[in-house]
Curated annotation (Swiss-Prot):
Family indicated by similarity: Belongs to the metallo-dependent hydrolases superfamily. MTA/SAH deaminase family.
PANTHER family: AMIDOHYDROLASE-RELATED DOMAIN-CONTAINING PROTEIN, AMINOHYDROLASE SSNA-RELATED
Cofactor annotation: Zn(2+)
Reactions performed catalytically: S-adenosyl-L-homocysteine + H2O + H(+) = S-inosyl-L-homocysteine + NH4(+); S-methyl-5'-thioadenosine + H2O + H(+) = S-methyl-5'-thioinosine + NH4(+)
Full protein name: 5-methylthioadenosine/S-adenosylhomocysteine deaminase
Annotated Zn(2+) binding sites: 63, 65, 209, 297
Described function: Catalyzes the deamination of 5-methylthioadenosine and S-adenosyl-L-homocysteine into 5-methylthioinosine and S-inosyl-L-homocysteine, respectively. Is also able to deaminate adenosine.
Length: 430
């Protein structure tokens, strides 16, 4: 399959913006350059006229729980631990594989329609999440969440390992797998060491929640005499590739550890704000060389999966927190949501930029609209002015999965109907 995108304003993220074409063959970008300069030997099977559109790499949602779309609006305005123990965990105990499948498809629709092409997910019944990903056409890094203090901890680890063996590299390479220890307060050091050993054997990374709340910091300090970051260093977790969600409360020593170990951080500003967890020291992390991407967290604590809005929030929150309007400029935020996210997930050799050799994950934004005019700076427009409705066309791995805001891979009405029924049944059963 050969696809040609013509006459777009291209923001490749790597290198300067230009007006031109992007040519794709067998899912890979083979040309990105000025209009009319595509090699004469390239014969497109399909051509998209992107006049009046901006082309960017697909957005990368570095941390979410896709099936929790089913709990959107169910448990709001509560502290994190009360939210988990009183509301979320009881209803999660009722979830079936079918429930998680429909919740994940609902999340997939929402992500595609807001420009996300790749997401990192930690949950359970992950075979059904992977099935949804395969069907809807997204790219994803998936892991089974592991609770070390549970009576089923060993079984969960075995299931997590089996999931990796089944799905890592599946869906024509669109699905990658990790192991997912939930957090230091649910996974004691002895259990974490088992997870680390398994990740070494399977040669995959780890996805964990770290330093999210002050309560977590105080609990870990009381139990182990150190910060969660220092505890992870001591257990050997950081000897493996790690995706650390949140990292809100960090000392300078913590930041140095993250930088030295090459830990990837998923910054989730809206979830952190909604749960009053705090403001992550993103500026200090970036200055120290920590890899930072952007995530939404789950729709139960955000309450959407809108990476367009998340970019704007990330930029504005750091400016007001630092008292400095120059920090996190638009171009850097867009980079964090694309190439930066790819680095955090260990996928930088495949996605994140519009360069020859990369997989063709492309978003076309319709910009000939009042709120995106005049065209002084499209990078700034995407961060400060655009909305999810401006996403017109989405391409994943060279396949057009949404055109004119219509998702082509699944029936949207069926997904909405099934998700609504599922969510109502769950809440009525609690």
């Amino acid at each position: 399959m050969r696809l040609l995108i013509r006459n777009a304003y291209v923001i490749p993220v790597a290198g300067s913006d230009f007006t031109g074409d992007v040519a794709v063959e067998e899912g890979r970008i083979v040309f990105a350059g000025p209009t009319g300069a595509v090699p004469g030997t390239f014969e497109a099977d399909e051509t998209i006229d992107a006049t009046g559109m901006v082309a960017t790499p697909g957005l990368v949602n570095c941390h979410t729980h896709a099936a929790m779309t089913l709990f959107r609006g169910y448990a709001d305005d509560l502290p994190l631990m009360e939210w988990l123990t009183r509301k979320i965990w009881p209803v999660e105990n009722l979830l079936t594989g079918d429930d998680i499948y429909w919740g994940s498809l609902l999340a997939g629709l929402e992500m595609l329609k807001s420009g996300t092409t790749t997401f990192a997910d930690q949950y359970f019944e992950m075979d059904r999440v992977a099935q949804a990903v395969e069907e809807i056409g997204l790219r994803a890094s998936l892991c089974r969440g592991l609770i070390g203090v549970s009576e089923h901890a060993e079984k969960a680890l075995a299931e997590g390992c089996e999931f990796v063996r089944r799905w890592h590299g599946a869906a024509a390479g669109r699905i990658s797998a990790m192991l997912g220890p939930h957090a230091p307060y649910t996974c004691p050091p002895a259990y974490l060491k088992k997870v680390v050993a398994a990740s070494e054997e399977l040669d995959v990374g780890l996805h964990i929640h770290l330093s999210e709340t002050r309560t977590e910091i105080e609990q870990i300090k009381a139990e182990y005499g150190c910060s969660p970051i220092a505890l992870m260093e001591e257990t050997g977790l950081f000897h493996r590739p790690v995706l650390a969600a949140h990292c809100v409360h960090l000392s300078e020593a913590d930041i140095k550890i993250l930088a030295r170990r090459g830990v990837g951080v998923a910054h989730n500003p809206q979830s952190n704000m909604k749960l009053a967890s705090g403001i992550a020291p993103v500026v200090r992390m970036l200055a120290a060389g920590v890899r930072v991407g952007i995530g939404t967290d789950g729709a139960a604590s955000n309450n959407d999966l809108n990476m367009v809005e998340e970019m704007r929030t990330a930029a504005l929150l750091q400016k007001v927190a630092q008292g400095d309007p120059t920090v996190l400029p638009a171009g850097l935020v867009l980079e964090m949501a694309t190439a930066g996210g790819a680095r955090v997930l260990g996928l930088e050799d495949r996605i994140g930029t519009l360069e020859v050799g990369k997989r063709a994950d492309v978003v076309l934004w319709r910009v000939n609209q009042p709120h995106l005019c005049p065209a002084h700076n499209y990078q700034a427009h995407l961060v400060y002015s655009a909305g999810r409705a401006d996403v017109d066309t989405v391409i994943v791995d060279g396949h057009v999965v949404m055109r004119g805001r219509r998702v082509l891979t699944v029936d949207e009405e069926t997904v909405l109907r099934q998700a609504e029924r599922t969510a109502r049944r769950l809440i009525e059963s609690v």
